[in-house]
């Protein structure tokens, strides 16, 4: 038995050593964080397994008001079923500037943090807009090569910061969440990703076509960091988080404390009420309580499609024309949503453990998004 144990230990050492030698050391962290905790993919509370940087809350927090009929309207049976089926942890409806309805599940509450996943892309795009206003970046057409000389040659020389925000970079990136060997998986678990990011090639002409790639926002975050001389967390806190009166500290996952690079394409841990604020800021054309935090023209451009053949995306925001309404939304893995109707001034926030794996015919969006919209409006219109 002792010889068997020693042999098994040596075999494990060889396997682990081989994994590192082949450049797949990040897989060991993936196994420890995901599979060893009983999950099959990244999850809402996984930020506790990573190094994070704090996005400091406002020193003058602005609590949301509540409508006179707050939580007076019952949820529809269809909405309740969706919550149960997809593991909702937070559901929030804001009318105007006030919370009209909210519910929490699974021991979450209004202060509980959970992972934004790709909703963070909307924050990074907003920071791009702010860097232009602040003079750090000249405009959407400024070349990425102005910040990183690795992009001065060939197709890469045509790459602009606007191409990164609108998902039109031509970057060689595999957007596969469940493939352990994909670059997306490596980016999530690799502790030193900065150099790897700058080694990736541009393989098709930038600015010509939409292709959703998390690497675009990762590189855009690095551009913003380089342009401002500040970490993304620091710049987000001073430019938007604090001016919007966010009540809680947020956390932004890092590749590692040693490297200190925010995962710009994902992974801000906060709560439903504070996530809703960016939706309100864009709903109000970049203005917050009378102060212009983002240029209104930039906001307007962000929530309209850049490419007519891909009307579902603008600059960092998902777009949905549904039942005569133009919605724009923040959207993240496993069904994290901030859905905005600028006409009715309604914001719907949903956070949770999973989403539908089906989509209506002809739609690029999962069916649960339509459920949350439809059932919220049944409640608002008194049809619950």
Spans of model-derived segments:
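Catalytic-site signature segments of enzymes, centered on catalytic residues
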Residues: 111, 178-258, 262-263
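Active-site Gly/Thr loop motif
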Residues: 248, 253, 299-347
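Active-site-proximal alpha-helical segments within enzyme catalytic domains
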Residues: 216-223, 264-287, 336-352
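Active-site helix/loop module of the DD-peptidase/beta-lactamase fold
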Residues: 134-172, 199-201, 228-265, 270
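N-terminal leader/targeting segments and the immediately adjacent pre-domain N-terminus
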Residues: 1-108, 137, 369-384
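Active-site SXXK
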Residues: 97, 115-140, 164, 220-224, ...
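Short, small/polar residue-rich loop motifs at catalytic or cofactor-binding pockets
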Residues: 85-88, 112, 333-334
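A short acidic/small-residue loop/turn micro-motif
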Residues: 105-109, 113, 354-356
């Amino acid at each position: 038995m002792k010889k068997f144990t020693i042999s098994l230990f040596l075999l494990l050492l060889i396997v682990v050593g081989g994994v590192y030698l082949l450049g797949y050391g990040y897989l060991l962290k993936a196994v420890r964080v995901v599979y060893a905790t009983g999950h099959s993919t990244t999850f809402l509370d996984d930020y506790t397994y990573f190094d994070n940087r704090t996005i400091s809350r406002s020193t003058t927090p602005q609590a949301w008001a509540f409508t006179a009929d707050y939580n007076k309207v019952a949820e529809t049976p269809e909405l309740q079923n969706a919550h149960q089926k997809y593991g909702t942890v937070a559901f929030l409806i804001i009318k105007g500037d006030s919370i009209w309805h909210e519910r929490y599940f699974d021991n979450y509450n209004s202060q509980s943090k959970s992972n934004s996943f790709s909703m963070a892309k909307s924050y990074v795009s907003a920071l791009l807009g702010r860097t232009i206003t602040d003079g750090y970046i000249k405009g959407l057409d400024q070349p990425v090569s102005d910040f990183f000389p690795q992009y001065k040659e060939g197709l890469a020389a045509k790459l602009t910061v606007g191409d990164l925000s609108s998902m039109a970079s031509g970057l060689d990136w595999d957007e596969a969440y469940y493939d352990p060997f994909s670059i997306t998986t490596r980016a999530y678990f690799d502790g030193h990703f900065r150099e790897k990011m700058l080694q990736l090639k541009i393989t098709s002409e930038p600015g010509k076509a939409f292709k959703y790639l998390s690497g675009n926002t990762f590189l855009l975050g690095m551009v913003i960091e380089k342009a401002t001389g500040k970490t993304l967390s620091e710049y987000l806190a001073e430019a938007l988080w604090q001016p919007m009166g966010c009540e809680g500290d947020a956390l932004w996952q890092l590749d590692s404390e040693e490297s200190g690079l925010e995962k710009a394409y994902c992974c801000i841990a906060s709560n439903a009420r504070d996530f809703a604020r960016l939706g309100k800021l864009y709903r109000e054309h970049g203005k917050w309580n009378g102060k212009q935090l983002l240029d209104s023209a930039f906001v307007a451009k962000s929530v309209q499609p850049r490419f007519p053949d891909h009307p579902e995306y603008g600059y960092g925001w998902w777009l949905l024309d549904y039942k005569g309404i133009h919605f724009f939304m923040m959207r993240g893995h496993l069904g994290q949503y901030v859905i905005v109707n600028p006409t009715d001034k309604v914001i719907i926030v949903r956070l949770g453990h999973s989403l539908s794996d089906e989509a209506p015919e002809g739609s690029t969006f999962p069916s649960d998004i339509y459920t949350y919209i439809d059932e919220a409006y049944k409640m608002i219109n008194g049809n619950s």
